[in-house]
Curated annotation (Swiss-Prot):
<dbReference type="Pfam" id="PF00318">
    <property type="entry name" value="Ribosomal_S2"/>
</dbReference>
<dbReference type="GO" id="GO:0003735">
    <property type="term" value="F:structural constituent of ribosome"/>
</dbReference>
<comment type="similarity">
    <text>Belongs to the universal ribosomal protein uS2 family.</text>
</comment>
<protein>
    <recommendedName>
        <fullName>Small ribosomal subunit protein uS2c</fullName>
    </recommendedName>
</protein>
<dbReference type="GO" id="GO:0005763">
    <property type="term" value="C:mitochondrial small ribosomal subunit"/>
</dbReference>
<keyword id="KW-0934">Plastid</keyword>
<dbReference type="GO" id="GO:0006412">
    <property type="term" value="P:translation"/>
</dbReference>
<keyword id="KW-0689">Ribosomal protein</keyword>
<dbReference type="InterPro" id="IPR023591">
    <property type="entry name" value="Ribosomal_uS2_flav_dom_sf"/>
</dbReference>
<dbReference type="InterPro" id="IPR001865">
    <property type="entry name" value="Ribosomal_uS2"/>
</dbReference>
<keyword id="KW-0687">Ribonucleoprotein</keyword>
<dbReference type="InterPro" id="IPR005706">
    <property type="entry name" value="Ribosomal_uS2_bac/mit/plastid"/>
</dbReference>
<keyword id="KW-0150">Chloroplast</keyword>
<dbReference type="InterPro" id="IPR018130">
    <property type="entry name" value="Ribosomal_uS2_CS"/>
</dbReference>
<dbReference type="GO" id="GO:0009507">
    <property type="term" value="C:chloroplast"/>
</dbReference>
């Protein structure tokens, strides 16, 4: 895998608050190598380490995108939901930004059945088929469609398991992370000072509570994916 320059700037990361960790009482001792200091009761992440792992992650997604691989971005906390959707849409990735439905990956056949149902209902709605049904039936199917749109809208074009999963918050998204580990799907995970750096394939030490921090990390990854995709399209 070729190493590239991704314009990862320490000053820019400081401005985004990437270096702010959790309180010193809420930490995982495994994160000690990634912590540079304590300040006013919170741990400070070593941004040199963050830059290194973010660069490795960018290299990985660029290489994968240049070979036509598929990505899934997961982040279901309310405040990060819009950033996750925006990043995924920009990079033409699949995403989950609401509740993670248990077994979404490990029980893929069930997810696939739900996706077929979702697509059928969307087609029925677009062609006016739902309006030709009795009111009670139409209302029930519209509620079903709304539910599927909420939870599966970001993966509606997914036809198989993703090749790489990007996880925004290890604590919040522990279930999808475990599903990826079970299936052997490579993961890139943003980890704060209370996380386990050994679980993901590439762990990026960063502030997972700050929107500006999350956006900066996602922006770098999205740029790398887009660059890789453009090369894949040119060579196709």
């Amino acid at each position: 895998m070729t190493r590239r320059y991704w314009n990862i700037n320490l000053e820019e990361m400081m401005e985004a608050g990437v270096h702010f960790g959790h309180g010193t009482r809420k930490w995982n001792p495994k994160m000690a190598p990634y912590i540079s200091a304590k300040r006013k009761g919170i741990h400070i992440t070593n941004l040199t380490r963050t830059a290194r792992f973010l660069s490795e992650a960018c290299d990985l997604v660029f290489d994968a995108a240049s070979r036509g691989k598929q990505f899934l971005i997961v982040g279901t906390k309310n405040k990060e939901a819009d950033s996750v959707a925006w990043a995924a849409i920009r990079a033409r990735c699949h995403y989950v930004n609401k509740k993670w439905l248990g077994g979404m990956l490990t029980n893929w056949s069930t997810t696939e059945t739900r996706l077929h149902k979702f697509r059928d209902l969307r087609t029925e709605q677009k062609t006016g088929g739902l309006n030709r049904l009795p009111k009670r039936d139409a209302a029930m199917l519209k509620r079903q469609l709304s539910h599927l749109q909420t939870y599966l809208g970001g993966i509606k074009y997914m036809t198989g398991l993703p090749d790489i999963v990007i996880i925004v918050d290890q604590h919040e998204e522990y279930t999808p992370l475990q599903e990826c580990i079970t299936l052997g799907i490579p993961t890139i995970c943003l980890i704060d000072t209370n996380c386990d750096p050994d679980l993901a394939d590439i762990s990026i030490p960063s502030n997972d509570y700050s929107i500006s921090s999350i956006r900066l990390i996602l922006n770098k990854l999205v740029f790398a994916i887009c660059e890789g995709r453009s090369g894949y399209i040119r060579n196709s």
